[in-house]
Amino acid sequence: MVNEYKRIVLLTGLMGINDHDFRMVKSLLSKELKLNKMQDEYDRVKIADLMEDKFPKDAGVVQLIKLYKQIPGLGDIANKLKNEKAKAKRKGKGKRKTAAKRQRQEEPSTSQPMSTTNEDAEPESGRSTPDTQVAQLSLPTASRRNQAIQISPTIASSSGQTSSRSSETLQSIIQSPETPTRSSSRILDPPVSLGTAYSSAQALGVLLATPAKRQRLKNVPKEPSEENGYQQGSKKVMVLKVTEPFAYDMKGEKMFHATVATETEFFRVKVFDIVLKEKFIPNKVLTISNYVGCNGFINIYSASSVSEVNDGEPMNIPLSLRKSANRTPKINYLCSKRRGIFVNGVFTVCKKEERGYYICYEIGDDTGMMEVEVYGRLTNIACNPGDKLRLML
């Protein structure tokens, strides 16, 4: 149950907000989570792990709902979290009821009469009790079902995906409690026909053979996919991450970066029409077309190149793919790549040197060191050795 709540916190609560709101939420939860300086830079996945440890009852869903109701623009997500929590709670109650019912079915009845070797003998009272009637009906039904159900494991094994839990569930459905061998001279209902039992077994076998598939990515891409030149075709993607608009030239023209993904790969995007910022919301599904691939980026210049998808078909982006797309690259990896590649991550400043009209920062991690030259208005940013520097290049 806690894992279900954690899924809601991570996928709906933390992945559903932008970076600015995430930093705000992290700041407001810092005392409850007891974040230190190193943990201040934790991403959404690590914060979800901390919340699961701090709030073992519901992984922090209630805390997020309270916070989101107070933050402008996050009211809808608060309501969504509330609904998801209610669904998870109902689902958990349903599972407990099913387990209790199954346990009652598997327990032998203490009120059943003792069996006798004379099957034609009449009951002493001259009539059957309700328990006796149930036992009389279950014996032929169960025996026929057990004969017919033998083909179900063969059907299920052809798929190679049958879980032991599904087998136990199937067993509890088709097996009756222990019944006495004593029979009565009166049977209220006709026994279940062999054809009916066979059809039921066959239907259960088909259900068992086709369990729900969990999407798993065999080869998780470590680098963004690239496309070159003008691309007229459309691509259905989910927005994973978006930056705030920033000026990219001396005229003050603005753009923003985004990371989007299909179910098997992810892409870096440059958007030069900031009107589209309203559409680029984390976890939103979009269709992009008529874009230009250049230097590892998808460049979008016009609002007409992006449209919202409302077909009702969800996109399931594997968590491993999300992690790969949001991971800060290592220094040795960046040094091995060509100039002009996309960089988005948080790095530690080891050294700072002012060189006239620009500043040279030396950043590093456990794999090496790299120099970063900063020009123009960015030289006014207060950043010193030991500080963390977020780079979006």
UniProtKB/Swiss-Prot annotation:
One Gene Ontology CC term in the entry: nucleus
Localization (cell): Nucleus
Biological process annotations from GO: activation of innate immune response; cellular response to interferon-beta
Residues in Pyrin domain copies: 1-87
Domain HIN-200, first and last residues per copy: 219-393
Family matches, as SUPFAM superfamilies: HIN-2000 domain-like
UniProt keyword annotations, A-Z: Nucleus
InterPro entries, alphabetized: DAPIN (IPR004020), DEATH-like_dom_sf (IPR011029), HIN-200 (IPR040205), HIN200/IF120x (IPR004021), NA-bd_OB-fold (IPR012340)
Record-linked CDD domains: Pyrin (cd08305)
Entry annotated with the keyword Zinc: no
PROSITE patterns named in the record: DAPIN, HIN_200
Stretches with biased composition (Polar residues): 108-118, 126-151, 170-186
One Pfam family matching this protein: HIN
Bias-annotated ranges (Low complexity): 152-169
Biased composition (Basic residues): 87-102
Positions of region (Disordered): 82-188
Family stated for the protein in its record: Belongs to the HIN-200 family.
Protein name in UniProt: Pyrin and HIN domain-containing protein 1-like
Species of origin: Mus musculus
